[in-house]
Amino acid sequence: MTTGAMPFSYAVSEFTTMPWTFEEDVTRYAALCVDTIEVCEQKLDPARAAEQMAIVAEHGLTVCAVQPRVRTFFASRITPDPQSLAERVAMLRGSIERLARFAPGAPFIVNTGAHPSGDMADAMRVVTRELARLAEVAADHGVKIALEPLNPTSVNVESAIWTVDQALDVIEGTGRGEIGLCLDYWNIWQNEGLDAAIARAGDRILSVQASDWRRPRSFADRIVPGDGAIPLGRLMRLTHAAGFRGACTVEIFSLDVADSLYESDLGDVITRSRAGLEAAWAAT
């Protein structure tokens, strides 16, 4: 066992508190001593987005990452429309152009989406090409883009890739420093060769997300860090050793289950999540 505080700032994704409004997220996160927020664009009113984003800094928070309204290149279960690749890329570009000034240096998180014919190789080629093009937009606006490999339960539904190494193959294929990795422990903790993959990622890790695992009973069944099977402390140590010094973001989805965390005290979820991460770090 080692001593010392968890070396990452504490962040919460707005997906964790889906029942709350954007304004409630900001004010309540600040009151709960959350350091930084992962903004979910779907919570913003397009007519008031600039006004809403301005209150983040007013409450002493920073933006550690942005989840665009459309964040996959191919259509997905969560965001099926528009179907056109060009339209989806245009929407992603628009998200960067609108929100980057409120999130300097932060990554915009994307994943591949589901290739219409299940062609993983083509999906990786297309996403590599489109990310390389979007890197110019990110560079012009002072932000980055983080590609997230999803859990195998999402393959051909939300994603064509499910391992850190697959994501890194795409990232490295862009040849651009603005493109990096979103490392979500719930998605990748069962990958073979994970230790080596995290080491390979190194300074390409732009975002880290945490929750915990029980055998899923729905498409969205994540639990509070420390309450499940993921070796969070070990994964945080590997991530730290790879050079990451950013925020550890609690990202929980909890839908279509009898004990949905969305129907519980979400302030308590935020508090318990921080305690779970700190305990996991201290225990390794």
Describe the role of every protein-language-model region.
Residues 1-33, 57, 94-97, 104-105, ...:
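Histidine-acidic metal/acid-base catalytic patches
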Residues 2-14, 65-77, 112-115:
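N-terminal small/glycine-rich loop or linker at the start of catalytic domains
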Residues 28-47, 67-72:
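N-terminal substrate-binding region of glycoside hydrolase catalytic domains
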Residues 38-58, 118, 155:
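Glycine-rich, proline-tolerant flexible connector loops at the mouths of alpha/beta enzymes
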Residues 72-79, 116-120, 152-157, 216-221, ...:
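A short acidic, helix-capping loop that chelates divalent metal ions and anchors anionic groups
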Residues 78-180, 190, 267-269, 276:
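Active-site acidic/histidine proton-transfer and metal-coordination neighborhood
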